[in-house]
Amino acid sequence: MASGAQLPPQPSSSEVSAVQSPGGRPGAGLEETALGVPLPPSPGEAPLPRSNRSRCPGTRQPGAASLHAASAAVPVRPRRGTAPAGKTADAVPAAAPEQAPRPAPQSRKPRNLEGDLDERRLLCHLQLAQDREARLWRGGKPQDEICDAFEEVVLWLLRLQNTFYFSQSTFNLALTIFGRLLISVKVKEKYLHCATITSLRLAAKVNEEEEFIPQVKDFTKHYGSDYSPNELLRMELAILDRLHWDLYIGTPLDFLTIFHALVVLSWPHVLELLPQRNPSLHVASLTRQLQHCMAGHQLLQFKGSTLALVIITLELERLMPGWCAPISDLLKKAQVGDMQYSCCKELVMQQLRSLQSSSCTDNFVSPAN
């Protein structure tokens, strides 16, 4: 009877051990949320977090009942030949074949759905970026009188030593903020340098962790020694006021990353044509091309999505000459007009040719010791 006294609390613990392995991940429910579909139950993962199982005892009622019946049947004289004991004894081996095939669907289903889920997720990100770009994009023609000065200051920013280890997206957002400013208002040439480094500081405030954002004095020491902290702060307020305190728009790098992922996901054999078959190295190379094109004064009139689309389609034409299917698919998803695309493509090709002999290096080098 001592063992019978311990039986009532055992069904829940045995139920947990039956559905969760000793090394099971406590955050298994997060995968279901990320994938957007419920994962199939398996012996390796619990269907609900521990806190929810205590509130929802009937979630796995059939399994709980069978396990309870099996454990309760053990102390009730199983070898006396009684009919109830024989039935409960048969129920234990009968339940084993039902659980045996469960791991197989779990290992197959996420892999079968993974491609579709990733593509849907990418298209969702693309749509959000396009909507935000359409809402914030003002358009307009760049100032012709600062054409050379603009290219010079952008190339200077790209040559900067990355003293504070800013990310690629931070530098790209800085160029985007600077370009939006020049489209929105006329900026005198003598203020271009100050506006450039201020755009970089604003981009760092948006993208970087708070502990990695340098103080104004440290920032001016490395990037703007000609300006006082007060001058930099006044320029920040001027840019924020002109851009309505809404700095984050879908950057060209955002669109480039999404387009590249869509191509690799929809056309997997493209990976065989990439340098070292490494998508990350390929994106880094395209990012350098993109940033160099953002130094082109005439390209300020195009949206970031259009510029990124042209960069990646030119690369696809180089890798797969004469094969138009991936390019047509991207053009449909990007929702870019034919005239805008053709005009931007011509200017991008000119810009890339003019920068082929340039000694400009990207700004993602570590500072010298």
Curated annotation (Swiss-Prot):
It comes from Homo sapiens. Belongs to the cyclin family. Gene3D superfamilies: Cyclin-like. Keywords: Cyclin. InterPro entries: Cyclin (IPR039361), Cyclin-like_dom (IPR013763), Cyclin-like_sf (IPR036915), Cyclin_N (IPR006671). Residues 1-116 are annotated as: Disordered. The gene is CCNI2. Residues 64-76, 83-101 have a biased composition (Low complexity). One of its GO terms (molecular function) is cyclin-dependent protein serine/threonine kinase regulator activity. GO terms for cellular component: cyclin-dependent protein kinase holoenzyme complex; cytoplasm; nucleus. This is Cyclin-I2. One of its GO terms (biological process) is G1/S transition of mitotic cell cycle.
